[in-house]
């Protein structure tokens, strides 16, 4: 090797002064890795306590069986609790249903009672109004029986107010008003008012012989009682002449 090549190598690989002072180490003198550094067990070494704890935690078949029994017991307890809660809620629901049915029935009765009272009140008001018109009807009836027209003019007037009377009676019928017809019927204080009593053998005792003032009904309500003459049995020893009792001579 010539000097030019050595000079070129020195320029290519310069060596620092510090590196030149470090002594070279031979392979025999380099440190070798020990077993402890490589992670291999050296001699007798104690087992890791965490591994033992994990093993104890996992347990054997007996411990697993006990754990399953505990879970089943807890689930059964929860199931019994839910069943008890369901039974209580079912009882509460039945109680609410019963109260609802009772309340619905009470409300229905209240509605019917209110409707009935309303109808009765309306009928009562209507009856009072119609009662005020009954004397007018009586006057028309008396005029019809007592007035006898003698001329064509009087007859025309008579027909005119009798036409008014007919219209009035038809209107009352349309409102549900009906006259009583008590003749020949047993006396009933609910509908009749006895004005006269006549001894007679022609009718049974307490039979209505004649209606003196006509009575009227509004459906089943008495607007005015019928004023009547009632038959009574003749006294013993009394002679009945033309339906009237008289003393024997």
UniProtKB/Swiss-Prot annotation:
GO MF annotations, alphabetized: adenyl-nucleotide exchange factor activity; protein homodimerization activity; protein-folding chaperone binding; unfolded protein binding
GO biological process, one term: protein folding
Sequence intervals crossing the membrane: none
Subcellular localization: Cytoplasm
Claim: Chaperone is one of the keywords in the record: yes
Chief site of localization: cytoplasm
Region (Disordered): 1-68
Biased composition regions of type Polar residues, renumbered to the chain: 1-15
Coiled coil: none
InterPro entries membership: GrpE (IPR000740), GrpE_coiled_coil (IPR013805), GrpE_head (IPR009012)
Keywords: Chaperone, Cytoplasm, Stress response
GO cellular component terms attached to this protein's record: cytoplasm
Any Pfam family: GrpE
Signal peptide (from-to): none
Lineage top rank: taxon: Bacteria
Job of this protein: Participates actively in the response to hyperosmotic and heat shock by preventing the aggregation of stress-denatured proteins, in association with DnaK and GrpE. It is the nucleotide exchange factor for DnaK and may function as a thermosensor. Unfolded proteins bind initially to DnaJ; upon interaction with the DnaJ-bound protein, DnaK hydrolyzes its bound ATP, resulting in the formation of a stable complex. GrpE releases ADP from DnaK; ATP binding to DnaK triggers the release of the substrate protein, thus completing the reaction cycle.
Subunit structure comment from the entry: Homodimer.
HAMAP family from the UniProt entry: GrpE
PANTHER family per the UniProt record, alphabetical: GRPE PROTEIN, GRPE PROTEIN HOMOLOG, MITOCHONDRIAL
The family this protein is said to belong to: Belongs to the GrpE family.
Name used for this protein in its record: Protein GrpE
Gene label: grpE
């Amino acid at each position: 090797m010539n000097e030019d090549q050595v000079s070129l190598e020195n320029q290519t690989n310069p060596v620092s002064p510090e590196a030149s002072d470090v002594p070279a180490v031979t392979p025999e003198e380099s440190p070798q890795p020990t077993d402890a550094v490589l992670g291999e067990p050296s001699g007798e070494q104690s087992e890791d306590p965490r591994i033992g704890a994990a093993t104890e935690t996992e347990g054997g078949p007996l411990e697993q069986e006990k754990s399953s029994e505990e879970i089943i017991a807890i689930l059964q307890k929860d199931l019994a609790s839910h069943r008890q809660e369901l039974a209580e809620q079912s009882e509460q629901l039945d109680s609410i249903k019963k109260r609802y049915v009772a309340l619905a029935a009470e409300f229905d009765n209240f509605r019917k009672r209110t409707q009935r009272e309303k109808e009765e009140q309306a009928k009562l008001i209507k009856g009072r109004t119609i009662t005020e018109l009954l004397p007018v009807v009586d006057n028309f009836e008396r005029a019809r029986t007592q007035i006898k027209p003698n001329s064509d003019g009087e007859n025309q007037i008579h027909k005119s107010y009798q036409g008014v009377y007919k219209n009035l009676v038809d209107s009352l019928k349309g409102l549900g008003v009906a006259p009583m017809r008590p003749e020949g019927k047993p006396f009933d204080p609910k509908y009749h008012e006895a004005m006269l009593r006549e001894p007679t053998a022609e009718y049974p005792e307490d039979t209505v012989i004649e209606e003196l003032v006509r009575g009227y009904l509004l459906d089943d309500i008495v607007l005015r009682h019928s004023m009547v003459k009632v038959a009574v049995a003749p006294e013993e020893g009394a002679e009945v002449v033309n339906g009237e009792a008289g003393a024997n001579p």
